[in-house]
């Protein structure tokens, strides 16, 4: 009898200890999740979708392993052009690994680029249906980026991908959104991302009513020799032309280019290759002026 009483006492003590430490463990887990040291616990729907075996592995702290295997399966969906299944699988992946920007980015790329283009080119579908699916999957990809940013607000790569998506000429561009996304990419990249800084300017310059902000940014970027690429030089010239006041052509060209020959060649290519519809203010006038100056020599 004493033996069973001891067993009962031990069980009561264990249950009491578990009950007492449960709030502490829950609070500790919450803090670890907030700090990014642990993945959030799986919800019931996710457990059901990945199956009992995978759920057991994930609960054992190996959610990244499960996500990797599902990612391999998602590649099969890509090869089969089964876009709904691919979307479903990436929703599972990001539920398992919400702090991995890679999965958010790849999911967005598959949906906004691969799926959207595939649906647009499926000749067996009516034209209206193709266009609707094309737009729908572009937005699905954008939604993945937004959710990824919510989970990883300090990751510059997702902001950069969002900027690239919204600036793409074939994806119903919104240059205001693109400019802000690139600005945040540059900011979260601690000001070291020169490509994102230039992309910020390219987008901002195409937003109506943002001429002053664009020229201020262009001047700031041009102070850094790394940013003095051909397109920045030409864009700065076009923006300076808008605000030139009493300044002469010679002054404007000298500010943006090293010499007349370089200016003529860069402006010619900038004007000729303008599929992205960058500002062209003063470009034709400058090209004609440079041609006349060359003829005088």
Feature locations, PLM:
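Active-site or metal-binding loop neighborhoods of secreted/extracellular toxin and effector enzymes
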Residues: 207
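Terminal, low-structured helical/coil segments at or just beyond the last alpha-helical repeat
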Residues: 211-297
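Short coil/linker segments at helix-helix boundaries
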Residues: 23-155, 160-187, 198-204, 212-216
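Hydrophobic membrane-insertion alpha-helices, especially the h-region
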Residues: 5-23
């Amino acid at each position: 009898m004493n033996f069973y009483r001891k067993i009962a006492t031990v069980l009561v003590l264990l249950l009491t200890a578990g009950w007492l430490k449960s709030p502490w463990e829950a609070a500790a887990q919450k803090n670890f999740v907030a700090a990014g040291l642990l993945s959030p616990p799986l919800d019931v729907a996710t457990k059901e979708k990945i199956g009992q075996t995978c759920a057991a592995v994930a609960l054992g702290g190996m959610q990244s392993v499960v996500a990797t295997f599902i990612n391999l399966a998602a590649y099969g969906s890509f090869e089969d052009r089964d876009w709904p299944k691919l979307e479903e699988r990436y929703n599972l992946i990001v539920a398992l690994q919400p702090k991995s920007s890679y999965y958010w980015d790849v999911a967005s790329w598959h949906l906004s680029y691969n799926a959207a283009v595939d649906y647009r080119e499926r000749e067996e579908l009516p034209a209206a249906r193709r266009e609707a699916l094309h737009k729908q999957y572009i937005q699905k990809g954008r939604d993945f980026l937004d959710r990824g940013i919510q989970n990883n607000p300090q990751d510059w790569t997702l902001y950069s991908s969002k900027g690239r998506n919204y600036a793409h000429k074939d994806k119903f561009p919104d240059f205001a959104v693109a400019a802000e996304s690139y600005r945040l990419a540059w900011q979260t990249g601690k000001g070291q991302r020169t490509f994102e800084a230039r992309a910020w300017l390219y987008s901002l310059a195409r937003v109506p009513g943002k001429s002053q902000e664009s020229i201020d940014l262009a001047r700031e970027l041009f102070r850094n020799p790394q940013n003095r690429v051909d397109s920045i030089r030409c864009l700065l010239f076009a923006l300076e032309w808008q605000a030139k006041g009493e300044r002469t052509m010679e002054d404007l060209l000298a500010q943006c280019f090293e010499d007349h020959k370089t200016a003529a060649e860069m402006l010619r290519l900038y004007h000729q290759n303008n599929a992205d519809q960058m500002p062209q203010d003063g470009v034709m006038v400058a090209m004609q002026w440079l041609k006349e100056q060359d003829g005088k020599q």
